Amino acid sequence: MPESVRHFRWSDIPEERVTDAISRKLITGDQMMLAHVYLKKDALVPQHSHHNEQLTYILEGALHFFIGANREREVIVRAGEVLHLPSNVPHEARALEDTLDVDIFSPPRQDWLDGTDNYFHKK
């Protein structure tokens, strides 16, 4: 394969513990990021926004999303469904059951790469 082409196996990617209830595995390209995010039932991803466009595809389980700065919209995304979040849209999510979600970001989430994603630890 040319040097710029890379092949990955999820089983070879280290799992990063984000909180007691959330962990993730990341694969990053030049212009996008692919993440497996594992959430235990009732895990909370606190409200945040980012300049990255996001696609969330639920492989197993379900997430209850609250969209907007004042939580104006609610969406439940279940296994086999996809949610598109444009850039800079405030959102939070709670796992309705143990969940595996696949997130795609463009460009890659620099805060996830350098550990500055402090919104996970807001009280």
Model-found features: residue ranges?
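Short acidic-glycine-tyrosine-enriched beta hairpin
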Residues: 71-87
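Short, charged beta-strand/loop "edge" motif centered at a coil->beta-strand transition
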Residues: 32-36, 43-46
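A short, N-terminal "cap"/entry segment at the start of jelly-roll beta-barrel domains
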Residues: 1-31, 35, 118-123
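Ligand-binding loop in jelly-roll beta-barrel domains
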Residues: 87-111
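Histidine-centered metal-chelating micro-motifs
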Residues: 44-46, 64, 82-83, 87-92
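A cytosolic small-molecule/anion-sensing beta-strand core signal
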Residues: 59-60, 78-79, 97
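Short, conserved beta-strand element in jelly-roll/cupin
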Residues: 38-40, 50-65
